Amino acid sequence: MTENRGRIGAGEDTAAVVAALHELIAGQAVADWQAVITAVQELDHVGAGPVGYWGMSMGCGLGVPLLAAEPRIRAAVLGLLGVHGLAEAAARVTVPVRFLLQWDDDLVPRDQGLALFDALASAEKTLHANPGKHGEIPGFEMDSSLRFLARHLG
């Protein structure tokens, strides 16, 4: 993390630094998440029902590659991230997606967030934009996101 802060402090593009970090982590995280899904679905009290994904910011950066690779995930709530480094994986995401964007995000440029939403190949996707900075998601969006997942997984 200190190295990344130094790169950003030296003037390197923040989006490129964050995208490189996500790519590094996602390489292992996708396999780890797939193993977790398999293990949980093997539990007698869980079974092989549909799976949902909820990920904001870094969770979105890891979630887009996971959604592109994992057919057991049937719906997702994503957001607070831009397209940099994710366009190819986003083009393979076809499940229903609810995308949250903070209009005044101080970390993710609005046009980059909108570009990620646009890059998602999902036929059923909705964009939910709210005033506020990165991470200041209104409580009603959390409640509504849970209803979205319940509707698609239930």
Name these PLM-found stretches.
Residues 103-108, 135-136:
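Acidic catalytic loop of the alpha/beta-hydrolase fold
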Residues 9-44:
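Alpha/beta-hydrolase active-site loop
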Residues 1-10:
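Conserved alpha/beta-hydrolase
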Residues 95, 109-118:
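Short alpha-helix in the alpha/beta-hydrolase fold that links the catalytic acid
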Residues 93, 99-101, 105:
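Short beta-strand/loop motif that positions the catalytic acidic residue
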Residues 114, 118-135:
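Catalytic histidine neighborhood in serine/cysteine hydrolases
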Residues 34-92:
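Primarily recognizes the serine-hydrolase "nucleophile elbow" in alpha/beta-hydrolase
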Residues 131, 138-154:
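Catalytic active-site module of serine/aspartate enzymes centered on a nucleophile-bearing elbow/loop
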